[in-house]
Amino acid sequence: MSKAIVLDSHLKEKGSVELPKRYEGINSHNLYLYVKHYLSSVRANTAKSKNRAEVSGGGRKPWAQKGGGRARAGSITSPVFVGGGVSHGATNKRNYNLKINKKQKRLALEYALEEKAQANKLFVVEKIAIKGVVEDNKRKHLTKEANQMFQALEQRDTLFVCLNMDECTELAFSNLKKCLIIDVNELNAYLLAAFSSVVMEEAAFQHVVQDKTEE
């Protein structure tokens, strides 16, 4: 059974906690489907080409219908002309969204957590909180403290997951390129797969692994 690594306040390993048994044997195809669903939902539908009705010009017939020895043409906006309209081109009216049901979303999340645990990249800490130093009635050095936490983990990049995250903690991590901190309600399988390691508050971890099969 896969286990998450429990860290102490100094981010040193002090134990482990098992993932529920239902996390075992989940098909990886659920994660594949969720990643396709996620990427399609954030895709910017901006590709657009002009058809022959939208390009400028073409108000008159370019040459006489007969007698010139050339193929007949009615307008320079025809797709056969350089600068004419595009046939079957990109349109910004296409809907790229792919549907996925709630059960597949849950299974994808559970599979991604299981993969992180098997790779020893899933960590649990009691609390993720950055307080900084109070100077001139303002909290300062927030990012410095957050960076020290990240460096102590010795990971390439890290996803931090909190429950009821405070503003100081959110600001502290916002300037770090290789870190992302989110509330547990924003957690999804794509983010778990995108980061090489995951650090979760104990309360957030319990919130995620509780049995939701009845929902």
Swiss-Prot record:
Record-linked SUPFAM superfamilies: Ribosomal protein L4
Source taxon at top rank: Bacteria
Record keywords, A-Z: Ribonucleoprotein, Ribosomal protein, RNA-binding, rRNA-binding
UniProt subunit comment: Part of the 50S ribosomal subunit.
Function (record text): One of the primary rRNA binding proteins, this protein initially binds near the 5'-end of the 23S rRNA. It is important during the early stages of 50S assembly. It makes multiple contacts with different domains of the 23S rRNA in the assembled 50S subunit and ribosome.
Annotated transmembrane regions: none
Protein's name in the database: Large ribosomal subunit protein uL4
GO biological process terms, semicolon-separated: translation
InterPro entries found in the cross-reference section: Ribosomal_uL4, Ribosomal_uL4-like, Ribosomal_uL4_dom_sf
Keyword Ribosomal protein found: yes
Biased composition regions of type Gly residues, renumbered to the chain: 56-71
Phylogenetic placement of the source organism: Bacteria, Pseudomonadati, Campylobacterota, Epsilonproteobacteria, Campylobacterales
Residue stretches in coiled coil: none
Residue ranges, annotated region (Disordered): 46-76
Pfam family, one: Ribosomal_L4
One GO MF term: rRNA binding
Any single GO CC term annotated in Swiss-Prot or TrEMBL for this entry: ribonucleoprotein complex
